[in-house]
Amino acid sequence: MRNFTELYRMDLPHRAISVYIYLADRANKDGICWPSISTISKDLKLSESTTRRALKDLYRAGLIQTEQRYRENGGNSSLLYRL
């Protein structure tokens, strides 16, 4: 969704709208990005818990899909977000 008019008309809290625009700005041409919760929070000046709530809002609204990414050693990495 590059035309944000639809987004603004949705019944979403401002935290979710801010995070969606952030993800859209960082997404590649396929609508994929993988910033960490810490990075999103720092860049948007939100707490990590607020960022997590915003991501849940977006997931429930069907605006994002998430996929767990893993490091070579098997440890968790940041989530992949698909818009």
In which residue ranges do the predicted regions lie?
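Short recognition helix of helix-turn-helix/winged-helix DNA-binding domains
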Residues: 1-65, 74-78
